[in-house]
């Protein structure tokens, strides 16, 4: 696995894409870093294979799914209410660039979220990348594989696609309602997993 990860890392440098997370392992945990301890709401759901480190706040009814990594070593990372961070997502921040997710934000599988702010009700698609200082408005949809470069800003209700990403159109009421439906479904799914998930091997 280490050899494969090194190979993909070299490809990442050459082709500017993010390697698949071969470095994730089981038995991840919640860590204090120095004086900083994650603040996780009692109603939040964090799987036992997720990693949460340091200056991280996770608010009510949010869910952190399998093999998610949230590393709050340089700046505060704030996850609002009713958010969901799906499998393999990575959240980090550089000095001077705190990371903030407003309420009802969905982060898709293997997305990379770095030192940015994402407005209420927005969804970040699978393997999308959002870099330092970027600002995503409310009720935006960031498409799968999109690359949002440093400092880029998008208004509310934007459909954001491409690498580098650009706003394609304005989302309509039905689009926005679907984003909310997805966020709501993860709140319910997390409650179900809390009650019914049982490890058998």
PLM region spans:
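Single conserved hydrophobic/aromatic residue that forms the stacking wall/gate
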Residues: 1-15
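Intrinsic-disorder-associated, low-complexity terminal segments enriched in Asp/Asn/His/Tyr and depleted
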Residues: 22-27
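C-terminal segments of enzyme domains that contribute to small-molecule binding surfaces
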Residues: 28-39, 47, 99-107, 111-112, ...
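Left-handed beta-helix
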Residues: 42, 47-48, 53-54, 59-60, ...
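Active-site cofactor/substrate anionic-group-binding motifs, chiefly glycine-
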Residues: 77
């Amino acid at each position: 696995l280490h050899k494969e990860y090194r190979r993909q890392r070299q490809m990442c440098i050459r082709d500017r894409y993010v390697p698949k997370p071969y470095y994730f392992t089981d038995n991840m945990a919640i860590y204090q870093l120095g004086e900083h301890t994650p603040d996780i709401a009692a109603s939040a759901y964090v799987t036992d294979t997720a990693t949460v480190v340091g200056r991280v706040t996770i608010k009510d009814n949010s869910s952190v799914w399998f093999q998610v990594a949230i590393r709050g070593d340089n700046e505060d990372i704030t996850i609002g209410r009713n958010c969901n961070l799906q499998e393999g997502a990575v959240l980090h921040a550089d000095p001077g660039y705190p990371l903030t997710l407003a309420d009802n934000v969905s982060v898709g599988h293997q997305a990379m979220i770095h030192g940015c702010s994402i407005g209420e009700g927005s969804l970040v698609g699978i393997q999308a990348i959002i870099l330092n200082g970027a600002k995503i408005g409310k009720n935006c949809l960031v498409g799968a594989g999109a690359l949002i470069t440093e400092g880029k800003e998008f208004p509310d209700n934007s459909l954001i696609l491409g690498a580098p990403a650009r706003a394609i159109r304005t989302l309509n009421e039905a689009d926005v309602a679907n984003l909310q439906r997805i966020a709501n479904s993860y709140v319910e799914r997390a409650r179900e997993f809390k009650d019914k998930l049982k490890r058998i091997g």
